Amino acid sequence: RFPHGLAHTIALLKTHYGVRSVGVWQAFQGYWNGLDESGVAAASCPTAITTTANGCLIPGSRAEQPAQFWDAWDGELAEAGVDFVKVDSQSSTSVMVRGTESYGEATWGRHQALDEVTSRRFGGALINCMGMAPEDYWHRPSSPITRSSDDYLPHNPDSLGEHLIQNAYC
């Protein structure tokens, strides 16, 4: 996707095109349904990964696991010149580990690690997204910016009700 690498692309955007800040999207589980077991991310920090009951690989919740995962991934992004991250799909984690971790266990350590790592790597420049479940927004120790609703689709009137409910309860 980036013929000369991500760092080169970001440097080009900033120096030649005047882009002040570059952000990267990522999912709280690594990707929507977790990490690819044969992918680079899973291979780079295997002790930081746990397998859910349905076989998804996601950052673990025990002790240093989530910090190890986020530090490895976000460290690479920071070294490439990324300035902030938007971490999506946060409320999916508690559903993915249902029956094996409590909602609090599913989120507290992972959010604490994410906030700590993004604070160190990006000066706290973190946008939390799709994390409108209470176990998510009450377990973020320091990141203040949260998108509190799922996607709003103005051309789909049925999406308005869900959008209003999610924002009213947050």
Q: Model-flagged regions — what are they?
A:
Residues 11-14, 106-107, 111-114, 122-123:
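P-loop/Walker A phosphate-binding loop and immediately adjacent motor/lid segment at beta-alpha junctions
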Residues 25-31, 90-92, 129-133:
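Active-site beta-loop-alpha junctions enriched in small/polar residues
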Residues 72-96:
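Active-site groove signature of glycoside hydrolases
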Residues 32-80, 112-170:
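Glycan-recognition surfaces
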Residues 22-24, 85-87, 126-128:
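Hydrophobic faces of well-ordered beta-strands that scaffold small-molecule active sites
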Residues 2-34, 119:
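Acidic/aromatic-lined carbohydrate-recognition and catalytic surfaces
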Residues 1, 9, 24, 100-102, ...:
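Extended, structured polyanion-binding interfaces
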Residues 1-5, 52-70, 90-107:
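The substrate-binding groove and active-site-proximal loops of carbohydrate-active enzymes
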